[in-house]
Amino acid sequence: LKDYRCREGSINNDGIILGISGLVVNKNKSYSNMKGIGFKEELLEFDKDECILNKKNNIDRYILKGNDYNKNVSIVINTDSGKYFNKMLDVSESKNIEINLLMNTSFLRDNITDNYNHSNILYKGSSLSDLNNFSSLLHNEFFCVKTNDYEIINDCKNKKLNSIKMNNEIKKDLLINTKKLLNNGAIIFIRENEFNLSELSSTINYIKSRGYNIVNINELLS
């Protein structure tokens, strides 16, 4: 294990692209571990080298995507009718990947049980009271997502929650449109509908064939 510095992200008027934190040797602790023994690599101790553009220090800015350095992407289903999301989850499970669900409070209350992976759930809404209700139901820490003109970040930053800006949502022609959006750190938002369900399996296969890892949103934005 070698040390390496933070690889910083970037910032523009729309928001931030996260960097990737590094590891640096803690010389004092490492020396103390090896005193009287001599150098042993396994006794090195490291400290995290945090980037400026990290989640913790940027709750007042929208996150646009994950870092540009790892070949990771994340798929988020923007729930709608509730008719198709379970079948879409079944497809992802058959491919041994995790995908995420974006929903409001009423959808969470009516459709999500304890059997679901709550850590892969994201929030959309248009009022502070809705956010409070969502939080009381889910309990987990989660990401907020701006899906329209409502500045959801104003509600979420007061609860120390990070916000993501959804710049593109794929409503149909999933495979073709995924090819256009695919890059390191991409968050691929797809509408919950029959069109995207029918192309989800082939789209996952394509993403993997291009050498990308499909990870959950927490890993992508870690």
Q: What name fits each language-model region?
A:
Residues L1-I75, K83-N86, D90-I99, N183-S222:
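Terminal accessory/targeting
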Residues K71-V73, S81-L174, T178, L182-I188, ...:
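Metal-dependent polysaccharide deacetylase catalytic core of the NodB/CE4 family, i.e.
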Residues N78:
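N-terminal beta1-alpha1 ligand-phosphate binding loop
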